[in-house]
């Protein structure tokens, strides 16, 4: 049995090493290195003269420069000083700035800043001259014959509609001195997708060439939730023109260092993403374009994701229409998936498996738009985990209960492996007398003892590592669930029961202040809530199902492991801790049933009795 205990402890130790090692030896040094790099970059920028990286507006030139923001003002004043068209939909409120037809005022009605439903709703986009300027705009680059074309300073006129809703689009117009008339129809669905249709009519006497462009601009670098658990910053999917698409990501720090990255593409999309929100542009898919992620230090520092299409030519008396999509909102999985065109076999399989998930979302067939949500390298495991959890949620209406049901489903999936694990443990226990005889026979001759043990395993058809593999195989499941709880907006502010009001946040209670009975806040390093303690108890019970290892070092690990995990998971999302506690509970029940079926004594009560007897003896 000692051999099996050693395998069990090795599996748990590996789990701890993976979690702690990843945190302390991978994440923390890189976070610190990034912080130092950012400080050095900022110091260098302070010494470097400001440069304007967007020269004039030739048809084959760069994008027109941004109008520099004036002194920072309040958001209310910035919105009030410009003529605007109101936005009022089921999901959104805000307005479109008629100067530049810029979307720079957008709030998300369905999301609050805190779990308190009376707290302010989330503000996503802000005017340029506010502290957190963040906006999207679309324009044109003209040539010598085109005259002035729509850009950042163009003042548009409202032709139709005063309020943009799901059912009432608005139309803006602008006519320049050469006879070009620009008509912009803006519509929005009931979620977060804006459709911008630009019709350009040439009433002049010469061919006119225009290059459409679009950009998402963000002033100042936002605070990111994490550096390596998920991606926040620039994101896009670029098409090569032959039906193939590649995902592109860039951190803010990387673009600060490089100033900009460029790529030529046909089809796809690009923008800026946060943990839960995003603003992205989908250029006209039939035109090739130059994409760019950039960082400017001229005046107020800003980050920008932009594209410039190849020029289109409009003959005299003719017109052309170009369609651009703009996503600005919450990264809800069904909505994002509904907008996406996923040609991979994996994506098609899930589309068929969960038919109906897209039915409530208007179809846009945006190439691989589902990658807007960072499912990570284990996409094939993380997304199915969420889909299963979401399925249960739609049945019971509570994500906490959905986590419990998902755990049961995972347990059923791993049941054959778990059965082998516990059967192996039972067989190892039956072989314990023979193993003790071999130890007595060979004494300190480890080589001879090992060979004899292997012969015994072979004769009895026992695999000594069979009990280890099921535990190791569940580690990716743990990380997949962690990723789901951490990145999906569906988990944000999702309640369970009692004191758990946000499954994506740590348990808010703490034993230091007696779980809220004492009137003070506990130190962060000592913050240990009720659910982590419950998890520690279930892990303690699970480990006591097996005999205590005779080796002192193994016995020490055996005793300390639940306590280490309890404190380690104290800062993890409550949903993950609930999963682990429930998983331990199911494992205890499962192990009890299987061991009883094999006629093996369950060691739980004997171990507990022995533990307390040893402690009692030490105190005498």
UniProtKB/Swiss-Prot annotation:
Q: Name one Pfam family in it.
A: 60KD_IMP
Q: Where does the UniProt annotation locate this protein?
A: Cell inner membrane
One Gene Ontology BP term is: protein transport
What are the record keywords, sorted?
Answer: Cell inner membrane, Cell membrane, Chaperone, Membrane, Protein transport, Transmembrane, Transmembrane helix, Transport
Task: Name the major location.
Answer: membrane
Say if the entry is tagged with keyword Membrane.
yes
Entry-linked InterPro entries: Membr_insert_YidC (IPR019998), Membr_insert_YidC_N (IPR028053), YidC/ALB3/OXA1/COX18 (IPR001708), YidC/Oxa/ALB_C (IPR028055), YidC_ALB_C (IPR047196), YidC_periplasmic_sf (IPR038221)
Query: Per its UniProt record, what Gene3D superfamilies does this chain match?
Result: 2.70.98.90
Question: In Gene Ontology terms, what is one molecular function of this protein?
Answer: membrane insertase activity
Disulphide-bridged cysteine pairs: none
> What family does this belong to?
Belongs to the OXA1/ALB3/YidC family. Type 1 subfamily.
Q: What does this protein do?
A: Required for the insertion and/or proper folding and/or complex formation of integral membrane proteins into the membrane. Involved in integration of membrane proteins that insert both dependently and independently of the Sec translocase complex, as well as at least some lipoproteins. Aids folding of multispanning membrane proteins.
How is this protein organized at the quaternary level? Answer: Interacts with the Sec translocase complex via SecD. Specifically interacts with transmembrane segments of nascent integral membrane proteins during membrane integration.
NCBIfam families, alphabetized: PRK01318.1-4 (NF002353), yidC_nterm (TIGR03593), yidC_oxa1_cterm (TIGR03592)
Q: What is this protein called?
A: Membrane protein insertase YidC
UniProt source species: Allorhizobium ampelinum (strain ATCC BAA-846 / DSM 112012 / S4)
Gene that this polypeptide is encoded by: yidC
């Amino acid at each position: 049995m000692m051999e099996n205990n050693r395998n069990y402890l090795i599996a748990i130790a590996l789990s701890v090493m993976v979690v702690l090692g990843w945190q302390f030896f991978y994440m923390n040094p890189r976070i610190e290195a990034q912080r130092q790099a950012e400080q050095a970059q900022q110091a260098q920028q302070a010494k470097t003269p400001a440069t304007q990286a967007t020269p004039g507006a030739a048809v084959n030139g760069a994008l027109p420069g941004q109008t520099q923001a004036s002194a920072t003002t309040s958001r209310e004043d910035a919105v009030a000083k410009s003529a605007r068209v109101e936005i009022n939909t089921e999901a959104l409120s805000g307005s479109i700035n008629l100067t530049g037809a810029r979307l720079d005022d957008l709030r998300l009605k369905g999301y609050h800043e805190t779990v308190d439903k009376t707290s302010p709703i989330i503000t996503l986009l802000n005017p340029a001259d506010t502290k957190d300027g963040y906006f999207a705009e679309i324009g044109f680059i003209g040539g010598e014959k085109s005259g002035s074309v729509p850009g950042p300073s163009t003042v548009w006129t409202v032709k139709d509609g005063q309020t943009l809703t799901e059912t009432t689009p608005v139309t803006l117009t602008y006519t320049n001195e050469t006879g070009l008339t620009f008509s912009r129809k803006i519509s929005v669905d009931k979620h977060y997708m804006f459709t911008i249709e630009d019709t350009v009519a040439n009433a002049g006497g010469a061919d006119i060439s225009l290059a459409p462009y679009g950009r998402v601009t963000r002033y100042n670098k936002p605070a990111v939730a994490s550096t390596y658990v998920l991606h926040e910053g620039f994101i896009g999917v670029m098409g090569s023109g032959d039906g193939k698409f590649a995902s592109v990501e860039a951190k803010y720090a990387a673009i600060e260092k490089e100033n900009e990255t460029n790529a030529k593409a046909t089809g796809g999309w690009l923008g800026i993403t946060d943990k839960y929100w995003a603003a992205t542009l989908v250029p006209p898919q039939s035109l090739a374009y130059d994409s760019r992620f950039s960082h400017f230090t001229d005046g107020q520092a800003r980050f920008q994701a932009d594209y410039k299409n190849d020029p289109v030519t409009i003959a005299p008396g003719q017109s052309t229409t170009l369609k651009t999509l703009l996503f600005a909102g919450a990264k809800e999985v069904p909505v994002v998936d509904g907008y996406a065109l996923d040609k991979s076999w994996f994506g098609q399989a899930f589309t068929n498996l969960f038919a109906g998930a897209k039915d409530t979302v208007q179809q846009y067939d945006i190439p691989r738009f589902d990658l807007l949500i960072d499912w990570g390298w284990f996409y094939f495991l993380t997304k199915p985990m969420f889909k299963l959890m979401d399925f249960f949620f739609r049945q019971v209406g509570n994500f906490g209960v959905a986590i419990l049901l998902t755990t049961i489903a995972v347990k059923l999936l791993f049941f054959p492996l778990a059965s082998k694990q516990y059967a192996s443990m039972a067989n190892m226990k039956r072989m314990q007398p023979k193993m003790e005889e071999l130890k007595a026979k060979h004494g300190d001759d480890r080589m001879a003892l090992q060979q004899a043990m292997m012969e015994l395993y072979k004769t009895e058809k026992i695999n000594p590592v069979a009990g280890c593999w099921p535990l190791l195989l569940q580690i990716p499941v743990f990380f997949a669930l962690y990723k789901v709880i951490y990145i999906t907006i569906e988990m944000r502010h999702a309640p369970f029961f009692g004191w758990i009001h946000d499954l994506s946040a740590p348990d808010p209670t703490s034993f230091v202040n007696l779980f809220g009975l004492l009137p003070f806040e506990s130190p962060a390093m000592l913050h240990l809530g009720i659910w982590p303690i419950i998890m520690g108890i279930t892990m303690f019970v699970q480990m006591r199902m097996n005999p205590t290892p005779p080796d002192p070092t193994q016995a020490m690990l055996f005793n300390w492991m639940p306590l280490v995990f309890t404190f380690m998971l104290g800062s993890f999302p409550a949903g993950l801790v609930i999963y682990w506690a429930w998983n331990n509970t199911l494992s205890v029940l499962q192990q009890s049933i299987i061991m009883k079926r094999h006629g093996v004594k369950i060691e739980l009560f004997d171990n507990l009795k022995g533990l307390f007897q040893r402690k009692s003896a030490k105190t005498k």
